[in-house]
């Protein structure tokens, strides 16, 4: 068995080379068909090493609690910014780029492989103001050096799932990328 697998892999590799040769030969005769563009920028702050990934554990939340209260209390998390240079930017706006919940616009949808259904994850300021995903937040004033921006994340039941008692229990996760815009 091992010998057959090895021979098949070698002959497949050889066929791959044969198919690539005509493509390579034609691309040698082409003129300037690949261009690279970009911009090198200086950011006002950096995210310290080890702080790039923010993981938040909600623990166990009962569907009965969500049927009664619609949402959980916020769980605090922090964005750490370091080496802030105010000559580059004195303010920062945050955008959480993520898949938006259809049942709760502005909140993060759960990942497709989540067992739980009928819920979404919301983000809010310490003053309880919603920070909708895919929208720019309010401005945060920066200080020279280190800055910490604190926010809350919460779980909320989708209205239809609450009315029809269709929140499904199970593990869940959601992911967002953070975009920082300095002014």
Indicate where each model-derived feature is located:
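Mature extracellular/passenger domains of Gram-negative fimbrial/pilin and adhesin proteins
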Residues: 2-9, 24-183
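Bacterial N-terminal signal peptides
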Residues: 13-24
